[in-house]
């Protein structure tokens, strides 16, 4: 399944090139379909590898949708083309965020969820850059709009971020606290963050800072879990806790 226009639904008005999204992999529920979760891979990966892991989880009532990011030049890699949800340079407070790329990917994800049945609970999860995109989607949901001002169309029920960070963290609090409705949505959205203390790719401090920024912005249903000895990868204990979180928060 290919989606050929990355700016569908994002309302991009610039002349920048629209990147083509890769293949989307779907893991069908083995039991009664109660929830659909988009799962987003990390930089340079694809949806296939995560779909195989997710299929093995004891969550029979969840449908997993694992899209593949567009291949685009990535500043962090010296402009080398790579599968990436958005462009990223160094991870720092001063590095500008690629909000056009983030909006494009967030819109692609929302479009995938928007075709699900009305009674199905919806969520977004991801690893590393995928986690960053999931957290950006959480802020779009709370604000009711993408960064470019176009309306965000999906009602999210949960967010999971493994080894990631929050793009645009500096401005999230002011944006959300400026709207009663945004503050209400932020307070209602369960977010589960996990991060390894030995992560050398996205250091643990970025997970801590993201958790702090989300908490200050009013995301009250927030959990942050640290793992001793864990680098930039996942382990069964972490995925077990993801399963427990989803069962509890989605009532599966």
Residue ranges, per PLM feature:
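Serine-hydrolase catalytic machinery in alpha/beta-hydrolase-like enzymes
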Residues: 2-123
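Active-site signature of alpha/beta-hydrolase-fold catalytic machinery across serine-
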Residues: 52, 136-140
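Short hydrophobic segments within beta-strands
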Residues: 39-40, 125, 162, 194
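Gly/Ala-rich beta-loop-alpha elbow adjacent to hydrolase catalytic centers
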Residues: 126-130, 134
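Hydrolases whose catalytic domains are alpha/beta-hydrolase-1, hotdog thioesterase
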Residues: 133-137, 145, 170
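Active-site catalytic pocket residues across diverse enzymes, especially alpha/beta-hydrolases
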Residues: 57, 141-145
């Amino acid at each position: 399944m290919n989606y050929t226009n990355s700016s569908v639904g994002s309302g991009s008005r610039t002349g920048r090139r629209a990147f083509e999204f890769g293949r989307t992999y779907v893991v069908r529920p083995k039991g009664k379909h109660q929830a659909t979760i988009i799962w987003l891979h990390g930089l340079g990966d694809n949806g296939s590898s995560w779909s195989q892991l997710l299929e093995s989880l004891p969550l029979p009532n969840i449908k997993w949708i694992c899209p593949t990011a567009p291949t685009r030049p990535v500043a962090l890699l010296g402009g080398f083309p790579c599968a990436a949800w958005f462009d990223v340079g160094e991870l720092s407070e001063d590095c500008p965020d690629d909000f056009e790329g983030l909006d494009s990917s967030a819109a692609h994800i929302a479009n995938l969820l928007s075709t699900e049945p009305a009674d199905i609970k919806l969520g977004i999860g991801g690893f590393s850059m995928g986690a960053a995109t999931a957290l950006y989607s959480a802020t779009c949901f709370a604000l009711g709009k993408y960064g470019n001002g176009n309306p965000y169309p999906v009602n999210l029920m949960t967010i999971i971020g493994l080894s990631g960070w929050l793009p645009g963290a500096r401005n999230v609090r002011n944006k959300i606290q400026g709207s009663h409705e945004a503050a209400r949505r932020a307070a209602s959205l369960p977010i589960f963050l996990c991060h390894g203390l030995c992560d050398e790719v996205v250091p643990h401090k970025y997970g801590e800072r993201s958790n702090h920024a989300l908490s200050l912005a009013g995301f009250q249903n927030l959990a942050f879990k640290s793992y001793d000895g864990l680098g930039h990868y996942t382990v069964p204990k972490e995925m077990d806790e993801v399963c427990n979180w989803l069962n509890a928060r989605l009532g599966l």
